[in-house]
């Protein structure tokens, strides 16, 4: 037994006979984990063998009980050196398991605890009745049981269940018997009730007229039950923790899910909260008619429910089986003041305040408008990302939005010395002093010790040390922090005498302190209080001295510095020790300054040492900044930008001089308790606060509830102190004749939302200032957060009632309204599109268009071409879109010149001008022939052909040349709208390899100062919020049921967490304006090393005002380029109607394999757009044979409710075919126009359908469209299909993707080894080289293994990706090609290489081997062979683990461990 274990056993008073037993002979404590916040101690014990069950229970009882006395929860687990046990011991521990937290759920315990177990030599077997031996218990409970047995010391004991037939029959018989008894009892109770009712009726007086009645009136019984339900007592949800009957809850629904069973019954699973907790509910409806009765069960509705609380197998938690339900009225908070007496909130945060506030700007504005407030100000922390949404919502709500932010203000330079004089630093006498206080507020806390060392040339020549009695007992926190007790201060000199003596002590010296602003501020406040002169002599702050001498140090506190410079500090936070240590540091700093910085004079400390970037370490003070007019808007954009891109250090900072330079059009408020005016008032008194408040335009005061955490932090004594601070702030305003505004520091809307903010804030950990703890050791806890909900006018007046009615009304209502009137309306988001100016852009677009059109179609142009170009150019040039087209054309051309194709996305392929100038390959004209020799053309305009690629080959009748075929029949309206004025969104797919170059092209074309990455805002996702809730639950000893966890996670989600950038979006600012006309800028995720700045606003907020280019990276262009490099074939010359390629969609014969060999009936594996399981299934069902049908498939697979439950059924039932169903959005307009509808109506119907609005528009509007379609013989199935669609894919997008896919497919058919090489190099996501190079049998076996895992839902994401790779490996091998092994001297770093009919994998295909190491291996082998494994590790940078893997796979051959020649290196 170890000494530590023995000591623990003695402490918990373990019985002597157990301590002396053999099982404790070599017991030990392996580890103890202490969780301070949750007060949990986890013990990990080691024993020579398993403990007898009675010893285990004794140990558990005594350990838990002993620690409980200290309010600590103790748990333990055991590692047994020898695991040997009997069935009896196994059964004992099995019973014990259900007393442990892991296994004590009611359903598990009730079903399993009485079962028998035995050990069969390899597993513990549980004999169970058949209905218990099911997947639910296996998946949800057996793993817990295995885990618990591991904690008992049984190691990795496998557990399984077997069905016991006898037990099953016995339980069935028992159940039937009990059921009969229950039915009999129920009948007896019913008869007794009827007899009692009859007895009452017999004893009642006879009525004048007797009407025969039934003995049992069902409707009356329901009515009585309902009356009882409405009067029933409401149970708070938090009080229900076990199964109970006839419980009544009231609450709000926050989650609803409806399901229909195979029998047609409906289940409504919903969750409600009453804000004490939450509960899962379940309500059944027998049919559709009954289901309609429960339409009130919807998200946000308030209900009263009654039912039984049961453990539910489906929800896996306590769930109410709802019997009665009723919608109730929820009385929301209202602003009760008259309409002309409503306040204005001037300090409100939205969910854009990073990890700090909850409401969306829309919800804040809506609430203010609902309450009748005339205006509301938005003041997020250091950002303005809510401005655009706030601007739009305020206009909609008819309320004035005042736009602002709560800024982090810092001084430009923080001085080292104050009150400088011309003095030789090395001839001066210094008084190095420190004070100890009862708190941080000079105005509210007391001095309790002043200590100082008078020093000359590094020697202490005199000391001062006096305690001061504050006149009240010291707090436990003060005593614990400083070591000063009431005995130290009791009987000490009067404070006036101590202050006078200290002033005398300091005469003629330089004062020195660490963080001198605090110590000097405290001294001056006390000097002023006792009418003594303030400090005027020089002061040196060693904190700033250290920061400027040693900026590379992370911490400059007294403790870290004394450790670094080996200066003794015996009792930190006792003034005498701190002062002496600070003095020793001072002379170290003076020596460094003299010898290495040439600083010898006091005047030089600030001029030579204070760094230009000292603002980075300056203390942050909050200020609220508001936009008064349009000039102010641009200035606030500039301030936000500078704070993020130039002055960012931990947070976005605004140096005071920068604020001064941009103050026009802005108004400033003093902000919260972190503002400098409040801090000065707290620390130095009202006069200091008045001096600082001159800088501001108004004074903020907040409700006492906002300041209460300061009491807990010992900054303010009590509620009276809070009220006095508020009165003092009002006095500051009165002295300066500045308005005082009552503001709410709003962080959430409803009081009950407080918990969500608590969870978000606490997730930041103790490193966040807001979570800094109060107290020390185990008792340390963060201060409570303030009650920061959005208050109504009457609630705000109540908060300030202590001021008297008139003064409260003045600061809450009068002043806020008067000040709000000073703000002009501003245009945050512009109403027009502003594109860059490019010289002759319109002419160049027109010239390029006509030049290409003449080249293809001849001059003069066919009328159909000429009219289309004329129509498009009128829209493009007339609306200022030419620059957008020209910019895209230049980018595509540059990428083409670098050897890459560029694919188009979205609906840009609907524009024929885009086709002609080279932006897209998709030709949107009707299907047509055109002669490449004489330009003669023929157009098919009757809708009989869906794609020009499907036209039969034909020779030109004029010159005999084979016609070229083209045209996808896509109307221009689908790109720029029916009126051609919609801002074009041109999305382009560049090769991932070429994407960085394309991004730089934008800078080159438009200028770096006008090109920015499109910014994004990342918010807390619900899964992340779930983790925050569980962490909060753990750290703060909370216990939430699953429904409450879900509710809290939902409430905490959506808060801004970080910023980022769109993967391909670049915003271009017009070169006749600057970016601050539209948005501030910043770096993504505050990464100051990023190559690009981003828009501060989410790019969607300004995408209709500036040019946005989507320059996305995509695999298809990369793949095409790779295939071109391998084959030398120009992909643009590949015909899209290659008959062998089309055979891939109907079978596998063209690949030379069978369905059985490759596991799929078509050749779709690895073909872009068509290779997923979902689309392969569609191909199998439809067997497309034309390009037009492939477009249909692409549209059907990308749309929502277009295929499943819609087109799929129509095709199966023979109502429609693949070519006639609705596939792409554009087909609707084209089909309806061919049917005879007017273009405008055809366009409008298409827009309604593609956006899923068909069933949301008014019935009159919808009926009008239906009638028009029927009048033109559009079939009913087509109309019904329109009503089911939620989203549709653009045909131009489909055409671009299918065209790329067919080019890839061409190589798969005709040049297979090139195809597989390109696929594995670019598209494959996972590799398993050992399997891939082991031949067909190994590949098929691994695929079977993953398939079986998928069926059990056990396959990992990596295995799923690997399966896709192996499908292609299998196909390649079945086609007669080989997969080689990784080769140390032949493999490429990143690409597969071809050797005859074999693919050699690259180094990056090895699991765990990254690109950098792969390239290092290739570089190293160029310098000569590797002579040993050690040399491979050193020269190749390969880890030992990878070397072992190489060796296991036979890659290293007979390479020795060490280079034998190296043994003799020292001799040469």
From Swiss-Prot:
Which terms are listed as keywords in the entry?
Answer: Cytoplasm, DNA replication, DNA-directed DNA polymerase, Exonuclease, Hydrolase, Nuclease, Nucleotidyltransferase, Transferase
Where would you say this protein principally sits, based on its record? cytoplasm
Q: Where is this region: Disordered?
A: 197-217
Q: Name one Pfam family in it.
A: DNA_pol3_alpha
Instruction: Give the range the annotation lists for the signal sequence.
Output: none
Substrates-to-products reaction catalysed: DNA(n) + a 2'-deoxyribonucleoside 5'-triphosphate = DNA(n+1) + diphosphate
A single Gene Ontology CC term? cytoplasm
**Annotated EC:** 2.7.7.7
Q: Which residues form the Exonuclease domain?
A: 430-586
Q: Which GO terms describe its molecular function?
A: 3'-5' exonuclease activity; DNA binding; DNA-directed DNA polymerase activity
Q: Where in the cell is it found?
A: Cytoplasm
- At the top level, the lineage of the source is Bacteria
Q: Name one GO biological process term.
A: DNA-templated DNA replication
Record function comment: Required for replicative DNA synthesis. This DNA polymerase also exhibits 3' to 5' exonuclease activity.
> What HAMAP family does this protein map onto?
DNApol_PolC
What family is this?
A: Belongs to the DNA polymerase type-C family. PolC subfamily.
Kindly provide the name given to this protein in its UniProt entry. DNA polymerase III PolC-type
Question: Which species is listed as the source?
Answer: Streptococcus agalactiae serotype V (strain ATCC BAA-611 / 2603 V/R)
């Amino acid at each position: 037994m170890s000494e530590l274990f023995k000591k623990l056993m003695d402490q918990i008073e373990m019985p002597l006979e157990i301590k002396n037993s053999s099982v404790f002979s070599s017991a030990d404590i392996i580890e103890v984990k202490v969780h301070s916040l949750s007060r949990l101690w986890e013990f990990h014990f080691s024993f020579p063998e398993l403990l007898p069950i009675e010893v285990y229970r004794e140990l558990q009882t005594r350990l838990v009980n002993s620690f409980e006395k200290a309010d600590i929860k103790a748990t333990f687990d055991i590692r047994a050196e020898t695991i040997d046990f009997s069935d009896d011991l196994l059964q004992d521990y099995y019973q014990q398991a259900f007393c442990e937290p892991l296994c004590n759920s009611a359903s598990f315990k009730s079903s399993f605890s009485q079962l028998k177990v035995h050990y069969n030599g390899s597993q513990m077997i549980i004999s169970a009745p058949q209905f218990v031996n099911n997947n639910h218990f296996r998946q949800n409970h057996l793993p817990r049981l295995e885990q618990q047995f591991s904690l008992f010391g049984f190691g990795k004991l496998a557990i399984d269940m077997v069905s016991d037939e006898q037990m099953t029959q016995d339980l069935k018989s028992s159940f039937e018997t009990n059921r009969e008894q229950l039915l009999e009892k129920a009948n007896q109770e019913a008869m007794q009730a009827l007899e009692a009712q009859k007895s009452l009726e017999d004893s009642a007086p006879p009525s004048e007229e007797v009407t025969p009645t039934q003995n049992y009136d069902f409707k009356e019984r329901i009515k009585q039950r309902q009356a009882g339900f409405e009067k029933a007592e409401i149970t708070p949800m938090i009080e229900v923790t076990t199964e109970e009957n006839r419980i009544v809850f009231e609450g709000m629904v926050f989650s609803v899910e409806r399901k229909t069973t195979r029998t047609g019954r409906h289940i409504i699973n919903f969750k409600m909260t009453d804000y004490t907790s939450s509960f899962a509910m379940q309500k059944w409806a027998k049919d559709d008619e009954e289901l309609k009765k429960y339409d009130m069960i919807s998200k946000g509705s308030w209900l009263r429910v009654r039912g039984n609380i049961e453990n539910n197998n489906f929800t896996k938690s306590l769930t109410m089986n709802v019997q009665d339900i009723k919608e109730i009225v929820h009385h929301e908070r209202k602003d009760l003041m008259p309409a002309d007496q409503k306040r204005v909130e001037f300090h409100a945060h939205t969910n854009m305040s990073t990890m700090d506030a909850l409401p969306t700007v829309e919800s804040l504005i809506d609430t203010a408008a609902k309450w009748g407030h005339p205006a509301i100000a938005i003041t997020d922390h250091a950002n303005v990302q809510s401005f655009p949404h706030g601007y739009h919502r305020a206009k909609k709500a008819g309320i004035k939005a005042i736009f602002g932010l709560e800024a982090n203000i810092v001084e430009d330079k923080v001085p080292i010395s104050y009150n400088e004089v011309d003095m030789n630093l090395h001839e001066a006498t210094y008084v190095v002093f420190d004070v100890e206080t009862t708190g941080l507020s000079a105005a509210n806390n007391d001095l309790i010790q002043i200590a100082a060392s008078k020093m000359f040339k590094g020697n202490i020549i005199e000391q001062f040390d006096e305690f001061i009695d504050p006149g009240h007992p010291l707090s436990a926190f003060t005593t614990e922090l400083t070591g000063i007790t009431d005995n130290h201060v009791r009987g000490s000199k009067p404070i006036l005498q101590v202050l006078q003596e200290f002033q005398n002590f300091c005469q003629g010296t330089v004062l020195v302190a660490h963080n001198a602003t605090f110590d000097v501020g405290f001294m001056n406040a006390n000097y002023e209080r006792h009418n003594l002169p303030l400090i005027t002599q020089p002061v040196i702050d060693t904190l700033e001295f250290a920061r400027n001498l040693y900026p590379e140090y992370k911490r400059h506190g007294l403790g870290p510095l004394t450790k670094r410079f080996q200066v003794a500090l015996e009792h930190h936070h006792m003034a005498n020790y701190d002062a002496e240590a600070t003095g020793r540091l001072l002379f170290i700093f003076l020596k460094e300054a003299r010898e290495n910085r040439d600083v010898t004079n006091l005047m030089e400390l600030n001029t030579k040492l204070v760094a230009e970037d000292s603002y980075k370490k300056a203390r942050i003070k909050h200020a609220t900044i508001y936009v008064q007019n349009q000039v102010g808007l641009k200035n606030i954009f500039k301030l936000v930008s500078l704070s993020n891109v130039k002055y960012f250090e931990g947070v976005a900072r605004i140096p005071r001089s920068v604020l001064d330079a941009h103050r026009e059009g802005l108004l400033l408020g003093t902000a919260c308790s972190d503002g400098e005016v409040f801090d000065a008032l707290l620390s130095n008194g009202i006069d200091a606060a008045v001096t600082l408040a001159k800088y501001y335009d108004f004074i903020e005061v907040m409700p006492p509830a906002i300041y209460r955490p300061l009491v807990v932090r010992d900054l303010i004594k009590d509620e009276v102190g809070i009220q006095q601070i508020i009165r003092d702030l009002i006095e500051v305003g009165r002295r300066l004749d500045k308005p005082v505004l009552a503001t709410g520091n709003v962080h959430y809307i409803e009081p009950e939302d407080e918990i969500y903010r608590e969870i978000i804030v606490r997730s930041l950990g103790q490193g966040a200032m807001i979570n800094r703890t109060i107290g020390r050791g185990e008792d340390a806890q963060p201060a409570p957060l303030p009650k920061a909900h959005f208050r109504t006018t009457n609630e705000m007046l109540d908060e300030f009632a202590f001021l008297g009615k008139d003064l409260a009304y003045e600061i809450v209502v009068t002043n806020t309204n008067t000040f709000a009137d000073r703000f002009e309306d501003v245009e945050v988001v512009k109403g027009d599109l502003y594109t860059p100016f490019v010289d002759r852009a319109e002419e160049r677009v027109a010239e390029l268009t006509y030049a290409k059109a003449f080249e293809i179609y001849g001059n003069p142009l066919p009328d159909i071409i000429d009219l289309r170009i004329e129509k498009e150019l009128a829209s493009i040039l007339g609306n200022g879109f030419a620059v957008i087209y020209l910019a895209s054309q230049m980018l595509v051309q540059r990428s083409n010149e670098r050897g890459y194709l560029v694919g188009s996305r979205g609906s840009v392929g609907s524009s024929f001008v885009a086709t002609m100038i080279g932006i897209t390959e998709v030709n949107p004209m009707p299907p047509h022939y055109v002669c490449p020799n004489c330009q003669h053309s023929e157009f098919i305009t009757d809708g009989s052909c869906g794609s020009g690629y499907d036209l039969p080959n034909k020779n030109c009748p004029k010159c005999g040349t084979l016609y070229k075929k083209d045209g996808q029949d896509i109307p221009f309206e689908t790109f720029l709208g029916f009126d051609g004025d919609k801002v074009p969104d041109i999305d382009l797919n560049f090769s991932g390899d070429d994407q960085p170059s394309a991004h730089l092209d934008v800078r080159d074309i438009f200028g770096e100062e006008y090109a920015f990455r499109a910014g994004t805002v990342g918010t807390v996702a619900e899964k992340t919020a779930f983790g925050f809730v569980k962490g909060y639950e753990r750290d703060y000893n909370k216990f939430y049921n699953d429904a409450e966890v879900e509710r809290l996670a939902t409430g905490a989600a959506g808060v801004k967490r970080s910023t980022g950038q769109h993967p391909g979006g670049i915003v271009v600012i017009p070169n006749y304006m600057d970016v601050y006309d539209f948005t501030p800028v910043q770096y993504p995720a505050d990464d100051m090393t990023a190559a690009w700045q981003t828009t501060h606003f989410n790019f969607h907020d300004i995408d209709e005002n500036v040019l946005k280019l989507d320059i996305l990276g995509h695999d298809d262009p990369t793949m095409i380029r790779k295939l071109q490099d391998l084959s030398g074939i120009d992909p643009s010359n590949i015909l899209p109607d290659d008959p062998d390629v089309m055979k891939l969609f109907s079978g596998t014969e063209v690949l030379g394999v069978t369905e059985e060999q490759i596991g799929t009936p078509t050749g779709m594996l690895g073909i872009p757009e068509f290779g997923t399981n979902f689309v392969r299934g569609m191909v199998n069902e439809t067997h497309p044979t034309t390009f037009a049908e492939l477009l249909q498939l692409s549209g059907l697979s990308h749309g929502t409710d277009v295929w499943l439950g819609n087109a799929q059924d129509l095709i199966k039932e023979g109502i429609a075919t693949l070519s006639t169903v609705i596939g792409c959005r554009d087909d609707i307009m084209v089909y309806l126009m061919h049917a005879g509808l007017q273009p405008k109506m055809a366009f409008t119907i298409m827009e309604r359908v593609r956006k899923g609005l068909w069933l949301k528009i008014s019935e009159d509007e919808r009926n009008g469209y239906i009638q028009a379609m029927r009048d033109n013989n559009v079939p009913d199935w087509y109309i019904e299909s329109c009503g089911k669609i939620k989203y549709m894919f653009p045909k131009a997008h489909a055409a671009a993707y299918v065209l790329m896919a067919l080019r890839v497919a061409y190589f798969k058919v005709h040049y297979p080894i090139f195809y597989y090489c390109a696929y594995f190099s670019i598209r494959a996501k996972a590799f398993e080289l050992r399997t891939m190079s082991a031949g067909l049998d190994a590949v098929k076996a691994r695929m079977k293994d993953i398939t079986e895992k998928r069926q059990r839902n056990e396959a990992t994401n990596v295995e799923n990706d690997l399966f896709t790779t192996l499908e292609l490996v299998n196909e390649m091998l079945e086609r007669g090609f080989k997969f080689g092994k990784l080769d140390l001297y032949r493999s490429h770093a990143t690409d597969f290489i071809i050797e005859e009919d074999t693919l050699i994998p690259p180094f990056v295909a090895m699991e765990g081997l990254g690109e950098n190491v792969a390239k290092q291996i290739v570089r190293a082998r160029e310098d000569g062979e590797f002579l040993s494994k050690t040399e491979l590790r050193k020269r190749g940078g390969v880890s030992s683990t990878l070397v072992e893997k190489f060796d296991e796979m036979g890659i290293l051959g007979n390479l020795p461990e060490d280079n034998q020649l190296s043994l003799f290196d020292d001799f040469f």
